[in-house]
Amino acid sequence: MRENIGNLINFAIRAGKYALGESALNDARKGKAKLVLIAKDTSDSNKKRWIDKFTYCKVPCEIYGTKEELGFLLHKDAIAVLSINEAHIAREIKKLIKEEELNGIQKE
């Protein structure tokens, strides 16, 4: 996980602007969630289920990090779904993820 993205996620966590799992979905339904991170090692069927639910709520989703990496940020074992509930932080995280994807494509 890239350090800058981890720092932004930590900032959202310290500010209390995050939710996990079903709570993230509840926040999405209430219009609070601005971005959802789904761990890349989540099973394909669960990824599809989460993406469908968040897409229905009009919340962008990114596949990023592993369950353990996301869990580490919250001092938990593993986290599959994390919502960022602050627009500016979500925008910056999304921008950095896109840059990381572009850099990965250029290296291949």
What are these regions (language model features)?
Residues 71-108:
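C-terminal structural segments of small proteins and small subunits
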Residues 41-42, 66-69, 87:
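Short, ordered loop/turn segments at secondary-structure junctions
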Residues 26, 43-44, 88-90:
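Glycine-rich nucleotide phosphate-binding loop and flanking beta-alpha elements
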Residues 30-52, 59-60:
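N-terminal positively charged helical leader segments and presequences
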Residues 22, 40-41, 84-85:
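Fold-independent oxyanion-binding glycine-rich loops
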Residues 53-81:
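Mid-chain, well-packed structural core segment of small domains
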Residues 4-38:
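N-terminal first-folded block
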